[in-house]
């Protein structure tokens, strides 16, 4: 049977209300916002998508549909370095199947904090697609441009990952599985396969998805966990969970090379270096505050908090806006005794010794300014909802006051959030999964 079509000619799915309709009032139809068949099954579009790797889900049909829905004229595409090789192909597809022109944003994108809606708007874009990261910046917080996040879920040989864990750990072991957002689906599949023989947890550090970690944000694991297994390439994200759990054995499974390795981190050296930097800063009278301008890295709220603390202590300070922070740049400010960078905590942790003056994180600055206690386990909670203090982005003191909203849905009817266990990319509200009403 031919599907019903709305005024624009696209198919719609009508859901009949279960409750009686009041007499004298026109019935209300709820129309699911789904991809029309003429886009999802367009043979020309499917053929064009073959230039992209099959195991990378760039969600092209949904992107085309969202752009058409928004009647977008200029679409900005932002992606990390590892995905830029596909940017031109995606741009060509968008321009072929929509009336929009595309702009590929070439500035470096290190992570989810680098969402650059400000630049997209300055370029005249009215729609932006950010690839490869989760929705750290909510879609309702972007300015003047509609936002679509594409996680780029990557299919891997999950069975080999599961077999590798079975080979290396005895049955009954307590394991924590973590990853980046690209492999979260594979992580959940592995958990399902392993949970009969192992005590498997997929820890969550909200607002991140279950199992997802960032280079600056990772959960604290229960002491009963025997080992944490990271699914992904590289060490940057893995080191985050290692720093926040120094007593837990860490392993890495590279889904590309299929190599499984035990990983180590020099906690004592890191803590010594950071402690020395804090000690030097304790007696400083002239401070430099750096607000990162690479996308949304910088937090004005943290900046304001640091300024108020320095003012209360009678310390002088200078503000500096930088998209990237290099030692030679900071050497130009000889009068500054200590720097605090509100950008990426890992810059100080990983590269702090490369700078001639102490380069502190907001947390370390709070310790030096006698506001926070030094933690023997270094906190990796920069974007965590439950953090130690106002030197983190999502601390409760920085959240806007929200009016109480009457609950209209029963608890069991609540839509899955991307931070819920078992939620999929398609169910995430940041993907603009909404319902529209037609009279």
Curated annotation (Swiss-Prot):
Its main location: nucleus. One of its GO terms (biological process) is protein histidyl modification to diphthamide. InterPro entries: DPH1/DPH2 (IPR016435), DPH1/DPH2_1 (IPR042263), DPH1/DPH2_2 (IPR042264), DPH1/DPH2_3 (IPR042265). It comes from the Eukaryota. Disulfide bonds: none annotated. Pathway: Protein modification; peptidyl-diphthamide biosynthesis. It is an enzyme of class 2 (transferase). Keywords: Cytoplasm, Iron, Iron-sulfur, Metal-binding, Nucleus, S-adenosyl-L-methionine, Transferase. Binds 1 [4Fe-4S] cluster per subunit. The cluster is coordinated with 3 cysteines and an exchangeable S-adenosyl-L-methionine. GO terms for cellular component: 2-(3-amino-3-carboxypropyl)histidine synthase complex; cytoplasm; nucleus. Its EC number is 2.5.1.108. One of its GO terms (molecular function) is metal ion binding. Component of the 2-(3-amino-3-carboxypropyl)histidine synthase complex composed of dph1, dph2, dph3 and a NADH-dependent reductase. PANTHER family: 2-(3-AMINO-3-CARBOXYPROPYL)HISTIDINE SYNTHASE SUBUNIT 1 (PTHR10762:SF1), DIPHTHAMIDE BIOSYNTHESIS PROTEIN (PTHR10762). Belongs to the DPH1/DPH2 family. DPH1 subfamily. This is 2-(3-amino-3-carboxypropyl)histidine synthase subunit 1. The gene is dph1.
